[in-house]
């Protein structure tokens, strides 16, 4: 039988030690003692007991001295190994009172305008949209279905150059507004049913859902760009080739608000679509075609407008959706040879519903921003920015 030799502690002489501690073969008691007393006042003290050393008993100064003489080193101490932190850094809870700088006792008082607001005249932009509706589609296309005509305008499958913004201010933001507003108008000219309605309803619908169009367009383009590894998980891509990295891009909104930029994103969360990262992953997995993409755009925008206005506009939007739904059915059955497409269509509708739910969820934030004058801008057409965070609904 093999007998394992017992090792003694080099500090106190105890038998059957439990291994090497801080560079020395010792017992656990001496290891714990050194961990607690190393670097303390006992280094400077002299022996405290006349019986020190008897029966392997040492006073604290002598025991600590023997630890150092045996070769124990504080450099072997290990820190921050606890799975649960023993203490946490206290932070001031985030609240609306902290953001607007008003105490909760008076938070429900509607303040007066404390500064001059910047007026944004959108008449020229709306005029351009009217001209686009009058001129009709840029490249007339005789398609079998209206959904195919819409798909001819979409450049979802085309390559696009990458341009990264280093700084975003109110100037760049107004460029985004103009791009998506006019892009939505041009897209609508390819829909024959839309071209048949009165001009005033065309403008009313465009003013209401251009930003909804922009949300889905950004999600689709971002999914495609990430699939091609053209941008990272922290960046967002637009269909005009621009890439936004909120971790690296400097955002300056000082011209439209007196509040810190990091607080403004709370109110602009709906239009930035930062909550829709899971939907981007779903779109990457689905790899929607141009036909499906345009159906998603139409269903999302017309459904949003119908719920917002009700009445006759709801009937018009329902008719639009019915026409395009029939076209999508024909696309699946005749072109894709997929008569059982309910599963894929269900995933597509789930994404659209998530976008609409995100809009409804963030709507109260826009109400708060308007009540407490978070943004110092005033628009000639405020209905254009409902559900964006800039104006009150």
Curated annotation (Swiss-Prot):
Sequence ranges assigned to domain NR LBD in this UniProt record: 121-388
UniProt superkingdom: Eukaryota
DNA-binding region(s) in UniProt: 6-79
Localization per record: Nucleus
Keyword Transcription regulation: yes
GO cellular component: nucleus
One Gene Ontology MF term: sequence-specific DNA binding
Zinc finger (NR C4-type): 9-30, 47-62
Record Pfam families: Hormone_recep, zf-C4
Keywords: DNA-binding, Metal-binding, Nucleus, Receptor, Transcription, Transcription regulation, Zinc, Zinc-finger
Keyword Metal-binding: yes
InterPro entries in alphabetical order: C.elegans_Orphan_NR (IPR051152), NHR-like_dom_sf (IPR035500), Nucl_hrmn_rcpt_lig-bd (IPR000536), Znf_hrmn_rcpt (IPR001628), Znf_NHR/GATA (IPR013088)
Location, primary (coarse class): nucleus
Role this protein plays: Orphan nuclear receptor.
Family as reported in the entry's similarity comment: Belongs to the nuclear hormone receptor family.
Protein name: Nuclear hormone receptor family member nhr-90
Source organism (scientific name): Caenorhabditis elegans
């Amino acid at each position: 039988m093999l007998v394992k030799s017992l090792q003694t502690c080099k500090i106190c002489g105890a038998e059957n030690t439990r291994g090497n501690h801080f560079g020395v073969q010792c017992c656990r008691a001496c290891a714990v003692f050194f961990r607690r007393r190393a670097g303390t006042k006992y280094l400077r003290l002299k022996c405290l007991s006349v019986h020190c050393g008897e029966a392997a008993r040492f006073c604290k100064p002598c025991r600590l001295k023997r630890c150092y003489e045996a070769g124990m080193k504080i450099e072997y101490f290990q820190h921050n190994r606890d799975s649960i932190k023993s203490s946490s850094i206290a932070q001031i809870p985030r609240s609306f009172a902290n953001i607007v700088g008003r105490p909760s006792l008076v938070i429900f008082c509607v303040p007066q305008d404390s500064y001059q607001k910047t007026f944004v005249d959108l008449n020229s932009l709306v005029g351009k949209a009217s001209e686009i509706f009058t001129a009709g589609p840029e490249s007339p296309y005789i398609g079998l279905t209206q959904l195919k005509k819409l798909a001819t305008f979409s450049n979802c499958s085309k390559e696009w150059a990458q341009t990264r913004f280093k700084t975003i201010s109110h100037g760049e933001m107004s460029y985004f507004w103009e791009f998506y507003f006019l892009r939505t108008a041009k897209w609508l000219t390819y829909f024959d049913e839309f071209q048949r309605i009165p001009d005033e309803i065309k403008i009313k619908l465009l003013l209401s859902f251009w930003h909804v169009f922009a949300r889905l367009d950004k999600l689709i383009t971002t999914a495609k760009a990430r699939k091609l590894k053209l941008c990272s998980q922290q960046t967002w891509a637009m269909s005009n080739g621009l890439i936004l990295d909120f971790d690296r891009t400097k955002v300056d909104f000082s011209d439209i608000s007196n509040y810190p930029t990091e607080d403004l994103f709370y109110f602009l969360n709906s239009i930035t679509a930062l909550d829709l990262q899971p939907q981007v992953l779903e779109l990457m997995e689905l790899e929607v075609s141009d036909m499906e993409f345009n159906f998603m755009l139409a269903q999302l925008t017309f459904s949003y407008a119908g719920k917002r206005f009700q009445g006759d506009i709801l009937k018009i939007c329902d008719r639009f959706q019915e026409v395009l739904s029939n076209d999508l059915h024909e696309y699946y059955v005749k072109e894709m040879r997929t008569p059982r497409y309910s599963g894929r269509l269900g995933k597509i509708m789930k994404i659209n519903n998530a976008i609409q739910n995100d809009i409804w969820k963030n709507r109260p934030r826009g109400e708060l921003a308007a009540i407490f004058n978070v943004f110092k801008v005033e628009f000639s057409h405020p209905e254009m920015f409902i559900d964006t965070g800039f104006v009150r609904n």
